[in-house]
UniProtKB/Swiss-Prot annotation:
Record keyword Disulfide bond present: yes
Stated name of the protein: Baseplate wedge protein gp10
Subunit structure: Homotrimer; disulfide-linked. Heteromultimer with gp7; a gp10 molecule is disulfide-linked to gp7 and the other two remaining gp10 molecules form a disulfide bond. The gp10 trimer interacts with gp11 trimer and with the short tail fiber (STF) composed of the gp12 trimer. Part of the baseplate macromolecular complex which consists of gp5, gp5.4, gp27 (central spike complex); gp6, gp25, gp53 (inner baseplate); gp7, gp8 (intermediate baseplate); gp9, gp10, gp11, gp12 (peripheral); gp48 and gp54 (proximal region of the tail tube).
Family under the similarity heading: Belongs to the T4likevirus baseplate wedge protein gp10 family.
Conditions for induction: Expressed in the late phase of the viral replicative cycle.
Residue stretches spanning the membrane: none
Keywords, in A-Z order: Disulfide bond, Late protein, Viral baseplate protein, Viral release from host cell, Viral tail assembly, Viral tail protein, Virion
Lineage of origin: Viruses, Duplodnaviria, Heunggongvirae, Uroviricota, Caudoviricetes
UniProt-annotated location(s): Virion
Length: 602
């Protein structure tokens, strides 16, 4: 934080900083600048990137304006983005993968409550090697970044391209499969090799435990994948099959439909390490018969699909209990395949976990993986699944049934050119309104349809439900609007003094703008004489007046006025309600019924 030197009011008045204190502030200011803009000693005009290691913690609380080089070699990292305000629009946070580890241990972006990432509140996983993110905070509380941008390239598409090649071995002892895709490189970060139906192990990085790699310069040498050739560590027999499958550009799109997780098992008696989600699981392997799926580092909001789950122990595909002739239940303590006979023989009829079984929660979401296998220190469990049932062998009609429940039928996009955003949620209306650049809206999601029906600034009313609309519509940010006031249509005729001008949006000269949002009126009014027309009584009357010219009740010509009793009058108009000062005010309120009124602000 910047420190200012207090120079006092006049020379040597004793109110300013003394020389040493001023020097300390200067040094601290420069130290902070040199650290934020460089390595602490030298400023970098190209920008200063601070390294963050997963070993320092799996959660990084990002700060405005900072740049992070994130090393996930030891585990996944979640980036919690800061909560912004209108004043934070256009502020930037950068993150990149210079260690080439995000494809192995991805980074997950999490927006603060009320904010979104590209319009969605769901966390976003970035699992592309050499990813280069520039996160910009935009209106209204929305983080934006360029997809598919990497340090070494920008991929041309976000569409997942899958290439697959199968080989039937015709030469005994064959290990090499050269130029697999005939001049086209495969993705070294996403490639699957199967030998006789069993998926071979490669690992996060190439090692002596890898079952395959690429040919080296020396005879029989196995080296890291080169993007073109494949060499197996173990030779094949005639008639064996080898399948090679790779996922090209659009890895993020592919991962959204196909997900892979793996962990290495470590015996707590043989290591001092602790469990790290998505990387290692430390426990007493001699007694371990289950493992929670959370140990695989699952993304919130992206659960495992049990219909397409595949489990592999050390690269060998396992079968679900109850399938391929394997029992769903078995007899423990006796030799029997029948529940009744098992009980008679003194056994216990229990659910089988051979090869494995899955325990789910009340919503059918997998929670725990059970098995009968005994694992050793360093063994690997690999799980893969499609996030929807389209990845399984559904019929066309079954696919249509599933997609009808999940997706919106997409028609042609429409050009949007008049959309607006609010820039101040506390002062709703002009001048706190900004235009949105023209774009095309595709109707491929319910949220897009909602944006069309209820754009920013839309007023919504409900007669009985007092709750914020987001709690029952599921979309948008809403705020109570126009409490205790009625709505009047804005007049495009600027000469209308009441309903054409906005007295809440004044220019530098104090003149109101020709926009909606003007306010006025009152619930009651007190009438004044100026509000009344001239009035008088229909007939003249006699009014008591000592100086009146009309005498009633006495002699008209009594010189000394000592004769009979009389009263003098004059002719004039009569007054009314002379004591009503001030008069009672008049209520202007028309017959009404109240409703809950909201305006969409974001």
């Amino acid at each position: 934080m910047k420190q200012n030197i207090n120079i006092g009011n006049v020379v040597d008045d004793g109110t300013g900083d003394y020389l040493r204190k001023g020097g300390i502030k200067i040094n601290e200011n420069f130290d902070e600048l040199y650290y934020e803009l460089g390595d602490g000693d030298v400023p970098y005009s190209a920008g200063a990137w601070k390294t963050y290691n997963a070993s320092s913690g799996q959660t990084l609380t990002a700060e405005w304006g900072k740049s992070y080089a994130i090393n996930t070699s030891s585990g996944r990292v979640t980036i919690n983005l800061p909560k912004g305000t209108v004043n934070d629009y256009n502020k930037v946070i950068r993150a990149r993968d210079v260690f080439a580890t995000w494809n192995v241990n991805p980074v997950t972006l999490v927006a603060a409550s009320g904010d979104t990432i590209k319009g969605s509140a769901v966390p976003v996983e970035i699992n592309v090697r050499f990813s280069d993110l520039e996160l910009v905070y935009c209106a209204p509380g929305r983080w934006e970044y360029v997809k598919n941008k990497q340090i070494d390239k920008i991929t041309s598409s976000d569409i997942s391209n899958v290439a697959r090649k199968e080989f039937l071995v015709e030469v005994q002892g064959q290990t090499d499969f050269l130029d697999v895709f005939r001049g086209t490189s495969y993705n070294v970060n996403n490639i699957r090799v199967k030998h006789r139906g069993n998926e071979l192990y490669y690992g996060d990085v190439f090692s002596e435990n890898s079952d395959f790699g690429s040919p080296g310069e020396n005879e029989g040498e196995l080296v890291p994948l080169d993007g073109f050739n494949i060499r197996l560590r173990q030779p094949c027999n005639i008639g064996d099959t080898v399948q090679i499958e790779t996922f090209m550009d659009g890895v993020s799109q592919w991962r959204s439909s196909y997900t892979r997780r793996q962990i290495r098992l470590l015996d707590s008696k043989l290591t001092s390490k602790t469990s790290l989600e998505g990387s290692i699981y430390v426990t007493d392997l001699s007694t371990m018969k289950s493992i929670p799926f959370s140990a695989f580092g699952l993304i919130p909001g992206e659960p495992i699909n049990p219909n397409s789950l595949e489990v592999r122990f050390n690269g060998i595909l396992q079968e679900l209990a109850g399938t391929v002739g394997m029992p769903l239940f078995h007899c423990v303590g006796a030799d029997s395949d029948d529940e009744v006979e098992c009980s008679v023989l003194g056994g216990t009829w229990e659910q089988s976990h051979t090869d494995y079984s899955v325990e789910t929660d009340e919503n059918g979401i997998p929670e725990i993986l059970h098995f009968d296998s005994v694992f050793e220190h360093g063994d690997i469990i690999n799980i893969t699944w499609f996030n929807n049932d389209l990845g399984t062998l559904l019929t066309k009609d079954e696919i249509i049934d599933e997609t009808d429940n999940l997706y919106v039928s997409q028609g042609p996009g429409v050009d949007i050119s008049g959309d607006v955003n609010l820039t101040d949620f506390d002062k709703i209306g002009w001048p706190n309104v900004e235009a949105v650049q023209s774009y095309q809206r595709a109707f491929n999601a319910v949220s897009n349809i909602f944006d069309t029906i209820y754009p920013i600034g839309t007023i919504y009313e409900n007669a009985v439900n007092p709750n914020n609309p987001v709690t029952y519509m599921g979309f948008g940010s809403w705020k109570l609007f126009g409490q205790g006031k009625v709505l009047v249509g804005w007049n495009e005729d600027i000469s209308d003094p009441n309903f054409a001008l906005n007295n809440n949006d004044l220019d530098s000269g104090g003149n109101p703008s020709h926009t909606a949002g003007g306010t006025g009126g009152s619930t009651s009014v007190t009438l004044e004489n100026a509000n009344l027309p001239a009035t008088e009584t229909d007939e003249e009357v006699l009014i008591v007046d000592e100086n009146g010219s009309v005498i009633v009740g006495g002699c008209q010509y009594d010189p000394d006025e000592s004769g009979p009793i009389y009263t003098k009058y004059r002719e004039a108009k009569a007054s009314t309600n002379s004591t009503h000062t001030p008069p009672t005010s008049i209520t202007n309120i028309q017959p009404y019924i109240t409703v809950y009124r909201w305006i969409r602000i974001a």
